[in-house]
């Protein structure tokens, strides 16, 4: 259903001439509404920063909190739609209607530099013209807005559950699990929350504080747990996890003591993008990304003194410092360097549609704390196989090609002809360890009386031993490196594979020979006698010792 909505005339006392002119020229706002619409998580239309707020006397704490709520994307969109005021039966004194008018006036009916005064409906029940805790005012405002919604729902639907747009946006579920250490039985309890308090007494970062929240607590002695299965008090462990993540996450850094109000003024780092998945009771699927959009800051020694201000991210993506009537632009670096009191994050379920964009290609790098560790492990364990089967055509697909007889003399001529082409490749190939092994093998071969073979090499004018690693023969030649005494191979070189042809591809590194697929099979059976190497018709075997 498509509904055309127009905003009512603003209060002249709170509107500047420029704002009135803007309202006269403003077109109607069209939004799509359905019966079961959920609050949007992003700005429907990019908006600039809201106007400054007048300090009526020690009211900086409520101004800072109202600015954060005004720039909460799903709440602002719901307020700008004016959906609630159209169904409210008693708009006078209604906190939801007052907040709707405040957000509409701040974002739509004001010019840059305008200042407005917060409605007394939002402030009178809490503000007594003295400094108060901004977080307490924030939670008081959300609870009273929630109650206003429930009154309307109960009048229209008496059987409806205690749900409201406020809980749909800010609400989540805690899961408290108690486990009996004797019978291992568990008991789960679920509680709603609107904010997540974080103990920062020993935490260096928000992520560490979130982990500390989930630490197991032992229940013993007077605090022992009564187990229904054991039917008596037993030692138990208690853990607390976020079971259902809210659309908007409020993280409250516990800087003030409960009794004296003294402040814990220590630096706690917080990210611009946060992945909440590791902190859920049942983490499944991919990352659960959140983006920072507002920060509430306190300067001073106690919560009842000092000064409050806030940073907000406007609908068009720019950051602003909201300090009562002053609205100044800033960068995200300034925002992340503050000693924050309350952090506001919005869930990003669809990165392509959310206005507070996070680089989609860097999501795992930014959000997943284990991504870099997993990436480094994959690189460490990924090793390239020394086998040459990955070069050229796979062995199972290679065709058996006919070969012709080639003499050593012809091989020498062809080698010298192609030596220049293959020289560059051989210079870049590290064969020093192989050449040392070949020298050792050569000494063993001499001890096994293979002088006739060496004399034959001298007659042909070619020293195969000096050309190991750079022998370049025609594609139809077959070269076999076969030591005379195979039985002594494993005992003489225990660090090598006990198959001489296993290293044949290391002895000949010429790319041309590898691509022909005519090297001897590495997986072949071990041959113990030289006489078994018989020449097939049309082939010339070169036995290299």
Swiss-Prot record:
Its EC number is 3.4.19.12. The active site is at 60 (nucleophile), 307 (proton acceptor). Gene3D superfamilies: Cysteine proteinases. Residues 393-404 have a biased composition (Basic and acidic residues). Residues 51-348 form the USP domain. Detected in T-cell, myeloid, and embryonic stem cell lines. Belongs to the peptidase C19 family. USP17 subfamily. This is Ubiquitin carboxyl-terminal hydrolase 17-like protein D. It comes from Mus musculus.
